[in-house]
């Protein structure tokens, strides 16, 4: 745009110069013509028709010279205009080429697309990256759901009783573990005392002690606890069996209800607690 504005200004200045030259030439021609007319008038009075013919020839010759001068002046600026226009176009093309070369030679960051082709490629790459991230997030969400499927956060306020039971179980387990450790240590100390002061026997005893011994002691503790629990359960079961062996107060609840009675005497069966038959029918007959 700046080059075009400069070219227009140059052409306008040249046109003004040409117009001023033309005006000057016209003024010169007019002054020469007026002088010739004055001379013609003077010569006409003295010489006559011959002088007038010569003046006409001079007038025409001067006019032709003026026209030729104008044509030459017009031809010269036209050539100058053509040369200046060619130079201006060449300069504009060179400037445009330089600007494009600078733009293309610049190292542009990927985040700022300046060319449409690069912009499209970057958009495609960004879409691919977004899809990959979404797929990874979906896979991670699935894994978390699978891991957290059976996990439930306990509510301490609502599950107070369950928490207390768990605490009791934990305390029992810890107490049992420490008791087993203490018992195992006592057993080892007793065996060492029995061995006496011999170092070999002590070394053999210490080497013979293994994890299995401790686990057996721990299992023995578990067995004793389980035996106690089983004994308590057996006593409770026996009590329930004794209660069940006792006959119910109502005869309908017995297992042998209506097993020995005949169907004809069904209306004579009493609903009393003693199970005796009432002879209502016989009394009424008598």
UniProtKB/Swiss-Prot annotation:
<feature type="modified residue" description="Phosphoserine">
    <location>
        <position position="11"/>
    </location>
</feature>
<keyword id="KW-0597">Phosphoprotein</keyword>
<feature type="cross-link" description="Glycyl lysine isopeptide (Lys-Gly) (interchain with G-Cter in SUMO2)">
    <location>
        <position position="112"/>
    </location>
</feature>
<feature type="compositionally biased region" description="Acidic residues">
    <location>
        <begin position="65"/>
        <end position="84"/>
    </location>
</feature>
<dbReference type="GO" id="GO:0000470">
    <property type="term" value="P:maturation of LSU-rRNA"/>
</dbReference>
<feature type="modified residue" description="Phosphoserine">
    <location>
        <position position="62"/>
    </location>
</feature>
<keyword id="KW-0007">Acetylation</keyword>
<feature type="modified residue" description="Citrulline">
    <location>
        <position position="9"/>
    </location>
</feature>
<keyword id="KW-1017">Isopeptide bond</keyword>
<feature type="cross-link" description="Glycyl lysine isopeptide (Lys-Gly) (interchain with G-Cter in SUMO1); alternate">
    <location>
        <position position="243"/>
    </location>
</feature>
<dbReference type="GO" id="GO:0030687">
    <property type="term" value="C:preribosome, large subunit precursor"/>
</dbReference>
<feature type="region of interest" description="Disordered">
    <location>
        <begin position="220"/>
        <end position="286"/>
    </location>
</feature>
<feature type="cross-link" description="Glycyl lysine isopeptide (Lys-Gly) (interchain with G-Cter in SUMO2)">
    <location>
        <position position="183"/>
    </location>
</feature>
<dbReference type="Pfam" id="PF07890">
    <property type="entry name" value="Rrp15p"/>
</dbReference>
<dbReference type="GO" id="GO:0000460">
    <property type="term" value="P:maturation of 5.8S rRNA"/>
</dbReference>
<feature type="coiled-coil region">
    <location>
        <begin position="112"/>
        <end position="148"/>
    </location>
</feature>
<protein>
    <recommendedName>
        <fullName>RRP15-like protein</fullName>
    </recommendedName>
</protein>
<feature type="modified residue" description="Phosphoserine">
    <location>
        <position position="270"/>
    </location>
</feature>
<feature type="modified residue" description="Phosphoserine">
    <location>
        <position position="210"/>
    </location>
</feature>
<keyword id="KW-0832">Ubl conjugation</keyword>
<comment type="similarity">
    <text>Belongs to the RRP15 family.</text>
</comment>
<feature type="cross-link" description="Glycyl lysine isopeptide (Lys-Gly) (interchain with G-Cter in SUMO2); alternate">
    <location>
        <position position="243"/>
    </location>
</feature>
<feature type="modified residue" description="Phosphoserine">
    <location>
        <position position="284"/>
    </location>
</feature>
<dbReference type="InterPro" id="IPR012459">
    <property type="entry name" value="Rrp15"/>
</dbReference>
<feature type="region of interest" description="Disordered">
    <location>
        <begin position="33"/>
        <end position="93"/>
    </location>
</feature>
<keyword id="KW-0175">Coiled coil</keyword>
<keyword id="KW-0164">Citrullination</keyword>
<feature type="modified residue" description="N-acetylalanine">
    <location>
        <position position="2"/>
    </location>
</feature>
<feature type="cross-link" description="Glycyl lysine isopeptide (Lys-Gly) (interchain with G-Cter in SUMO2)">
    <location>
        <position position="212"/>
    </location>
</feature>
């Amino acid at each position: 745009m700046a080059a075009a504005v400069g070219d227009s200004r140059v052409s306008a200045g040249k046109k003004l110069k040409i117009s001023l030259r033309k005006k000057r030439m016209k003024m010169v021609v007019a002054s020469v013509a007026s002088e010739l007319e004055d001379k013609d008038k003077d010569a006409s009075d003295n010489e006559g028709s011959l002088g007038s013919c010569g003046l006409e020839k001079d007038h025409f010759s001067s006019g032709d010279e003026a026209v030729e001068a104008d044509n030459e002046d017009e031809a010269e600026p036209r050539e100058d205009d053509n040369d200046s226009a060619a130079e201006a176009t060449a300069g504009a093309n060179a400037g445009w080429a330089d600007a494009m070369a600078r733009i293309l030679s610049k190292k542009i960051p990927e985040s700022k697309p300046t060319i449409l082709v690069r912009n499209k490629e970057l958009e495609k790459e960004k879409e691919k990256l977004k899809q990959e991230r979404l797929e990874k997030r979906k896979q991670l969400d699935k894994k978390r759901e699978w891991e957290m499927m059976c996990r439930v956060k306990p509510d301490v306020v609502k599950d107070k009783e369950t928490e207390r039971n768990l605490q009791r179980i934990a305390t029992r387990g810890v107490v049992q573990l420490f008791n087993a450790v203490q018992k195992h240590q006592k057993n080892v100390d007793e065996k060492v005392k029995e061995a006496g002061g011999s170092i070999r026997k002590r070394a053999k005893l210490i080497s013979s002690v293994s994890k299995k011994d401790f686990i057996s002691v721990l299992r023995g503790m578990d067995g004793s606890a389980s035996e106690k629990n089983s004994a308590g359960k057996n006593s409770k079961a026996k009590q329930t069996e004794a209660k069940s062996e006792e006959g119910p107060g109502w005869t309908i609840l017995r297992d042998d209800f209506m097993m020995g009675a005949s169907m004809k005497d069904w209306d004579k069966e009493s609903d009393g607690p003693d199970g005796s038959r009432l002879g209502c029918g016989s009394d009424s007959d008598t």
